[in-house]
Amino acid sequence: MKRTIAIVAGGDSSELVVSLRSAQGLYSFIDKERYNLYIVEMEGHRWEVVLPDGSKTPIDRNDFSFMENGEKKQFDFAYITIHGTPGENGILQGYFDLLGIPYSSCNVLVSAMTFNKFTCNQYLKGFGIRVAESLILRKGFEITDEEVINKIGLPCFIKPNAGGSSFGVTKVKTKEDIQPAIEKAFEESDEVMIEAFMKGTEITCGCYKTSDKEVVFPITEVVSANEFFDYGAKYNGESQEITPARLPEDTAERVRLLTSAIYDILGCSGLIRIDYIITEGEKVNLLEINTTPGMTATSFIPQQVRAAGLDIKDVMTDIIENKF
């Protein structure tokens, strides 16, 4: 009997549109001969299932069920592809845990920690992993331009501490731009991370593990036409993405080993993607960890799956079946 899979998309952040694109990607990737697939759209209090005829019907949040043709349908598995709250920060994971519904991503604790960039990076720094110098600023508190310059220096990045797709991120080069950048970041998050700029090559590496296999994908090098890998570079084609990355083999191997190690240190589950920057002397520096990475046809993970010579349908089946 076919399992019924919910591809859960949407969310309550600026990343909603990106998430809906990822849902379409996943719908095309997952094996429809093996699974019954439905896209579930969440936006605030609107939780709806998209039915095969394109109409939408509400989800019963008491048990995450829905009605189709007068029959109550229950989901066997949730593939979470919400980028941002509530799907990337542990909230939705906790809901599914309460209902006993298995899901694709990391658990509550890991999701919450990795969504908090500052906390995650400081935690991993304790394991000897290189990260940029940074500080955290919470809503209601202020920091002077001089403090930023003295503690972090210029240029620097000012970004929402919780968020993705580069919404609210500014590369700050001058003293005059510090406060406007902080205000912009606070529009996306209650906490702002101020991070030292690192000059180097941006790369990203995907990974997943099951009970009987470990897969670390070929690394992608990101060459942005913009100041940094911002929203335009990510989604409007304003970057060159090279897979496999043009790295010395020993550096690439260190990145692959580090990606696998971080997966285990944090206790990740499902597909993750880790962003790094390679600085002078082939030093590998962690930027951030994505536990619900983009899954559009042109996203990094599908690119890396193709470069590895794998079938993305098989990868999706691995992720789902590992939870049963």
Swiss-Prot record:
<dbReference type="GO" id="GO:0005737">
    <property type="term" value="C:cytoplasm"/>
</dbReference>
<keyword id="KW-0436">Ligase</keyword>
<dbReference type="InterPro" id="IPR011095">
    <property type="entry name" value="Dala_Dala_lig_C"/>
</dbReference>
<dbReference type="InterPro" id="IPR011761">
    <property type="entry name" value="ATP-grasp"/>
</dbReference>
<keyword id="KW-0460">Magnesium</keyword>
<dbReference type="GO" id="GO:0008716">
    <property type="term" value="F:D-alanine-D-alanine ligase activity"/>
</dbReference>
<feature type="binding site">
    <location>
        <position position="288"/>
    </location>
    <ligand>
        <name>Mg(2+) 1</name>
    </ligand>
</feature>
<keyword id="KW-0479">Metal-binding</keyword>
<dbReference type="GO" id="GO:0071555">
    <property type="term" value="P:cell wall organization"/>
</dbReference>
<keyword id="KW-0573">Peptidoglycan synthesis</keyword>
<dbReference type="InterPro" id="IPR005905">
    <property type="entry name" value="D_ala_D_ala"/>
</dbReference>
<keyword id="KW-0464">Manganese</keyword>
<dbReference type="InterPro" id="IPR011127">
    <property type="entry name" value="Dala_Dala_lig_N"/>
</dbReference>
<keyword id="KW-0133">Cell shape</keyword>
<dbReference type="InterPro" id="IPR000291">
    <property type="entry name" value="D-Ala_lig_Van_CS"/>
</dbReference>
<comment type="function">
    <text>Cell wall formation.</text>
</comment>
<keyword id="KW-0067">ATP-binding</keyword>
<keyword id="KW-0961">Cell wall biogenesis/degradation</keyword>
<feature type="domain" description="ATP-grasp">
    <location>
        <begin position="121"/>
        <end position="321"/>
    </location>
</feature>
<dbReference type="InterPro" id="IPR016185">
    <property type="entry name" value="PreATP-grasp_dom_sf"/>
</dbReference>
<dbReference type="Pfam" id="PF01820">
    <property type="entry name" value="Dala_Dala_lig_N"/>
</dbReference>
<feature type="binding site">
    <location>
        <position position="275"/>
    </location>
    <ligand>
        <name>Mg(2+) 1</name>
    </ligand>
</feature>
<keyword id="KW-0547">Nucleotide-binding</keyword>
<protein>
    <recommendedName>
        <fullName>D-alanine--D-alanine ligase</fullName>
        <ecNumber>6.3.2.4</ecNumber>
    </recommendedName>
</protein>
<dbReference type="GO" id="GO:0005524">
    <property type="term" value="F:ATP binding"/>
</dbReference>
<comment type="similarity">
    <text>Belongs to the D-alanine--D-alanine ligase family.</text>
</comment>
<feature type="binding site">
    <location>
        <begin position="149"/>
        <end position="204"/>
    </location>
    <ligand>
        <name>ATP</name>
    </ligand>
</feature>
<dbReference type="Pfam" id="PF07478">
    <property type="entry name" value="Dala_Dala_lig_C"/>
</dbReference>
<dbReference type="InterPro" id="IPR013815">
    <property type="entry name" value="ATP_grasp_subdomain_1"/>
</dbReference>
<dbReference type="GO" id="GO:0046872">
    <property type="term" value="F:metal ion binding"/>
</dbReference>
<dbReference type="GO" id="GO:0009252">
    <property type="term" value="P:peptidoglycan biosynthetic process"/>
</dbReference>
<comment type="pathway">
    <text>Cell wall biogenesis; peptidoglycan biosynthesis.</text>
</comment>
<feature type="binding site">
    <location>
        <position position="290"/>
    </location>
    <ligand>
        <name>Mg(2+) 2</name>
    </ligand>
</feature>
<dbReference type="GO" id="GO:0008360">
    <property type="term" value="P:regulation of cell shape"/>
</dbReference>
<keyword id="KW-0963">Cytoplasm</keyword>
<feature type="binding site">
    <location>
        <position position="288"/>
    </location>
    <ligand>
        <name>Mg(2+) 2</name>
    </ligand>
</feature>
